[in-house]
Amino acid sequence: MNDKFFDLKQEKQDRMINASLKIFSRGGYRHASTDEIVKEAGISKGLLFHYFGSKLGLYGFLFDYSARFMLLELSREVKRSETDYFALTKQMEQARMQVMKLYPYMQRFLDVAVKEEHTEAVERIAEKKLDYEDRLRAYSMQADYSIFAPYGDSVRVTKMVRYTIDGLTDEMSERYDFSPEKLFAEICAYLDTLRRMTIKET
């Protein structure tokens, strides 16, 4: 991590992080402009490079910070004993909602970054990306997917859930009255509906 950067006041750190997350999440590494980042953050380009050295240095820091922050929040919200797929999904979305309150573009940045194709960027985050994806997979593997077997295909159901959450996030984040809490409430309502459609409760 970057000790010099963390000596800054928290407000300035968050301003620079949020600006960088926003710009990198729009079109990936190749299309992100440091000019746009410094304009969004309200700082000089010299200051940005003082702390991160280069665009690639900033990108590497940002992925490391975001993955650590997201995984920490997931560890707080997700119960290790939880095996109910829909309850587990709600806990994971609760964690993402908490992250979104402070860093609105962090989840989107991570989603874009794991699909990044720019060679230098891919190499820079390769090790951290592997760890991040392994940790996310471990949470997903807690769920008991056998509950879907008599009534539906678990792969299709989980894809349907993911598409629903992603679609709601894209739709609601564009609204003028958007809030992470409203998004989470809507996601939970849809998850409850999908549960009734896919599981026959005993």
Model-assigned labels for residue ranges:
Residues 15, 23-57, 61:
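Helix-turn-helix
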Residues 30-31, 148-152:
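Short, charged helix-capping/linker segments at alpha-helix termini
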Residues 1-8, 202:
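N-terminal intrinsically disordered/low-complexity leader segments
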Residues 68-79, 83, 98, 119-147, ...:
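Amphipathic alpha-helical packing segments from all-alpha helical-bundle domains
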Residues 86-112, 137, 162, 196, ...:
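Helical hydrophobic small-molecule/effector-binding pocket
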Residues 12-20, 37, 62-66, 70-73:
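Generic hydrophobic, amphipathic alpha-helix propensity
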Residues 26-30, 81, 103:
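Short coil/turn segments at alpha/beta junctions that flank glycine-rich nucleotide-binding fingerprints
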Residues 100-121, 170-174:
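Amphipathic alpha-helical segments used for helix-helix packing
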